[in-house]
């Protein structure tokens, strides 16, 4: 027997998350995020997870978060900038980025590139390095994918 949902309250997701049935968050310019677990669908999560798919030649501007993040290159080829260092990554390789450290990921390949990300917290913010602007992760202001440079 299941408990009826409380109107206006987030509900736990299925124990099996199927990307094809999850509403996508379009960041613009060929970058799309598939949010898995977060405060939008769970009440007690301690992490926030999802996948982001990058078209060839796209990326997300240099930014930082208020919580740590690990990113796994799930498919394709990426350039990762973490702090002052730049890394070339392929599928199966991952990064760990402490809170407050500027970073970004760009698709350096000729096909799509997909990352799987995990944030170490429920209330995640993004601060754009170039402007200092801070906003809630996956809010309407969290768009603005750019061509890779």
Question: Model-derived features: where do they sit?
Answer:
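Conserved short histidine dyad/triad with adjacent acidic residue
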Residues: 33-37, 50-65
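Short beta-strand His + acidic residue motifs that chelate non-heme Fe in jelly-roll/DSBH
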Residues: 60-62, 80-81, 97, 103-109
């Amino acid at each position: 027997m299941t408990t009826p949902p409380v109107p206006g309250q987030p509900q736990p997701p299925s124990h099996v998350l199927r990307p094809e049935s999850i509403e996508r968050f379009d960041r613009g310019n060929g970058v799309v995020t598939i949010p898995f677990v977060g405060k939008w669908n769970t009440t007690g999560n301690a992490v926030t997870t999802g996948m982001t798919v990058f078209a060839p030649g796209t990326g997300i501007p240099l930014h930082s978060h208020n919580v740590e993040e690990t990113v796994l290159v799930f498919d394709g080829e990426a350039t990762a900038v973490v702090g002052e260092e730049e890394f070339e990554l392929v599928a199966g390789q991952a990064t760990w980025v402490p809170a407050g450290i500027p970073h970004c990921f760009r698709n350096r390949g000729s096909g799509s590139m997909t990352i799987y990300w995990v944030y170490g917290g429920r209330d995640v913010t993004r601060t754009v390095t170039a402007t200092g602007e801070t906003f809630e992760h996956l809010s309407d202001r969290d768009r603005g994918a750019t061509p890779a440079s």
